[in-house]
């Protein structure tokens, strides 16, 4: 995947201890926007100094999951975005696999990973690499086609 096709958005609230594993799992050339739901200037300075690929936005207050992610997504200039929780980390081929799925589907809004450790019909009976439709996704990692996602109006902040 070309690094100019994807931006990673990480919405945080006092996640100083958790976020380093997450950011260390991201390629240094990959653009990352961290939305910190506080006014912690020290956190912003430290994170931007340590990770040259990271832009940190301070909100001044806790906006929550939907509004914080929408703020981060409003700054994205790439075709795709990956919403990632600060306590999640990427495996080596995660971004490549998301892009492969995106190229297969084309008009998707959101793609999410299937977790092998959760019991579900798909985990037990389907090919692990198969793409299938679900009614909902876990919010810890969501790959967005921003053209389609904008059409549905981003995350509901209500």
Specify the residue positions occupied by each region the protein language model found.
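A recurrent flexible, glycine/aromatic-enriched loop bordering the glycosyltransferase active site
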Residues: 127-147, 151
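Short, well-formed alpha-helical segments that are part of the catalytic scaffolds
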Residues: 12-28
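Short aromatic/hydrophobic "clamp" motif used to bind/position activated sugar donors
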Residues: 81
